Amino acid sequence: MAARRKARKRALDLLYEADQKAVSGGAPASGDAVALLAERIATPHGEAPMREYTVEIVEGVAAHQARIDELLETYAQGWSLERMPAVDRAILRIGVWELLFNDDVPDAVAVDEAVALAAELSTDDSPTFVNGLLGQLLRLAPVLRDEEAAAGG
């Protein structure tokens, strides 16, 4: 497994765990993800060292989560964030962050990696759902990036 794919999977684990803790405890998920990341870096409990790209993903998703969630709510036809499987929600947050806020990842790679994570870790229908939603955002990416630049994001 490529280094970035491993980093994405680890970031997915952290975002998913933070999301689940937020659902059960009522705390904001983005703050929990960064706090959970810091905790794991400080006390790794036998885990491999945290990859730099894992840190970048978690911090990036947390920094832009309000906008990412707004886009997901807007373009996920017939689905609210709460109704989506939690794994899909985390995968989509990573995918949207890579598409719109990370210039180092080619757009097609961001979509393909998100679909691969969905195929590996979620429901049978998830890869199609993730591909369709990220594909729609990919088509809108130039406009969305311009909006982010104009807003200072």
UniProtKB/Swiss-Prot annotation:
Transmembrane segments: none annotated. Gene3D superfamilies: NusB-like (1.10.940.10). SUPFAM superfamilies: NusB-like. GO terms for cellular component: cytosol. One of its GO terms (molecular function) is RNA binding. It comes from the Bacteria. Keywords: RNA-binding, Transcription, Transcription antitermination, Transcription regulation. GO terms for biological process: DNA-templated transcription termination; transcription antitermination. Signal peptide: none annotated. InterPro entries: NusB-like_sf (IPR035926), NusB_fam (IPR011605), NusB_RsmB_TIM44 (IPR006027). NCBIfam families: nusB. HAMAP family: NusB (MF_00073). Belongs to the NusB family. PANTHER family: ANTITERMINATION NUSB DOMAIN-CONTAINING PROTEIN, N UTILIZATION SUBSTANCE PROTEIN B-RELATED. Involved in transcription antitermination. Required for transcription of ribosomal RNA (rRNA) genes. Binds specifically to the boxA antiterminator sequence of the ribosomal RNA (rrn) operons. This is Transcription antitermination protein NusB. The lineage of its organism: Bacteria, Bacillati, Actinomycetota, Actinomycetes, Micrococcales. The gene is nusB.
